[in-house]
Amino acid sequence: YVQFVSNVMYSWVWGGRNMSGSLEYYFNGFGQSDGRYDPISLANNPDLLVRLSRGELFTLGRHYLSANVMIEMSPLWILTPTVFMNVEDPSALFQLVTTYSLSDNMTLLGSVNIPIGPGGTEFGGIESGLPDRYLSRGAGLFAQFAWYF
């Protein structure tokens, strides 16, 4: 099986703010070749399931695009919107990450994660095997305070 990642990155100044954007393509040779995420189709791909259970992979499909822009709101505050898209189905994950440096040894990190897509898609919710029931994480919020000493 083959896995492949390609990335392009560019930095610039816009509106007096430092910006850095990237576009990335990821190919997962272990992913579902037919784009079906129902329990029977997934069970027929044991190589994928083993790698998911071991934490070696985090995606079900084969083709993904990711785009993000890091915006330096101030020298201490960085805001980064990111979208992860499954190219083979109409689903994506939108993530907004913020980092604020409270001092030389303290940082506050937060993110909002919003899955986008209809039921039956990777980020919208994969089929559970029960009628009209999908396995999905839903929107999420994360916060972390880090103190370095």
Features from the language model and the residues they span:
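Membrane-embedded beta-strand positions of outer-membrane beta-barrel proteins
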Residues: 21-23, 69, 81, 98, ...
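Long, well-ordered mid-to-C-terminal structural blocks that present hydrophobic/aromatic surfaces
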Residues: 1-48
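Residues that define the transmembrane beta-barrel architecture of outer-membrane proteins
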Residues: 2-4, 61-65, 90-94, 137-141
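Transmembrane beta-strands of outer-membrane beta-barrel pores
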Residues: 12, 25-31, 71, 83-89, ...
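Extracellular loop and loop/strand-boundary signature of outer-membrane beta-barrel proteins
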Residues: 51-55, 82-84, 128-133
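Outer-membrane beta-barrel "beta-signal"
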Residues: 112, 133-149
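Repeated loop/turn-to-beta-strand initiation elements of outer-membrane beta-barrel proteins
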Residues: 15-21, 75-79, 105-110
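Outer-membrane beta-barrel translocator domains and adjoining extracellular loop/strand segments
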Residues: 1, 33-40, 83, 92-97, ...
